[in-house]
């Protein structure tokens, strides 16, 4: 009986399982920092889409997506770059994020593009990202502030507003929008 069990075990352990490896996706958002109240819903939305694709059974012959989260902080480019390097070293093939324009540019320039990792931001709007030397690896779903600022300026002109005071948050987002509006 022992020989039968041992033979069965050896036979089973040498069989090919034909299992497909997971597709590793990274989500990097400012889970801490000035927009931390927004990022849980952003991450959950991405994970919902990834789960739907996985559960369909039609993704690349039935492969599944596994997700790893990282914190961009939204404001600390060095911390965001380190977090993105961790995602890449763990084998992610694409990154959803980052959220804020400054850290998004830092991650794209220093991590994603040099490592050939596709990156798509749901919210980075800095006009500077438009001309990023990304070799086709960076995308965003939100329009550039160059467009938003121009529309706001056009509305102001159409309404014949004579005087405007501009205040803005002193970061890439605020400065980019203010510069375009002026």
PLM region descriptions:
Residues 69-70, 75-93, 154-158:
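Short, well-structured alpha-helical segments in soluble
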Residues 26-47, 70-77, 99, 167-175:
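Extracytoplasmic "Venus flytrap"
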Residues 22-24, 66, 162-163:
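Residues that mark the start of a beta-strand
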Residues 89-182:
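Extracytoplasmic ligand/sensor domains, especially the bilobed periplasmic-binding protein
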């Amino acid at each position: 009986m022992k020989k039968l069990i041992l033979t069965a075990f050896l036979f089973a352990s040498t069989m090919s399982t034909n299992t497909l490896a997971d597709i590793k996706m990274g989500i990097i958002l400012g889970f801490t920092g000035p927009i931390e109240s927004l990022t849980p819903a952003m991450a959950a939305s991405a994970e919902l889409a990834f789960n739907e694709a996985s559960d369909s059974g039609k993704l690349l012959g039935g492969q599944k997506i596994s997700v790893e989260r990282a914190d961009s902080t939204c404001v600390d480019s060095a911390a965001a770059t380190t977090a993105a390097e961790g995602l890449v070293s763990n084998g992610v093939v694409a990154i959803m994020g980052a959220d804020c324009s400054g850290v998004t540019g830092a991650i794209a320039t220093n991590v994603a593009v040099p490592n050939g990792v596709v990156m798509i931001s749901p919210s980075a709007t800095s006009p500077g990202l438009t001309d990023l030397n990304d070799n086709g690896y960076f995308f965003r779903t939100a329009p550039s502030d160059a467009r938003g600022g121009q529309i706001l300026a056009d509305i102001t002109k159409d309404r014949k507003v004579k005087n405007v005071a501009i205040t803005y948050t002193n970061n890439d987002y605020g400065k980019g929008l203010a510069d375009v509006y002026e």
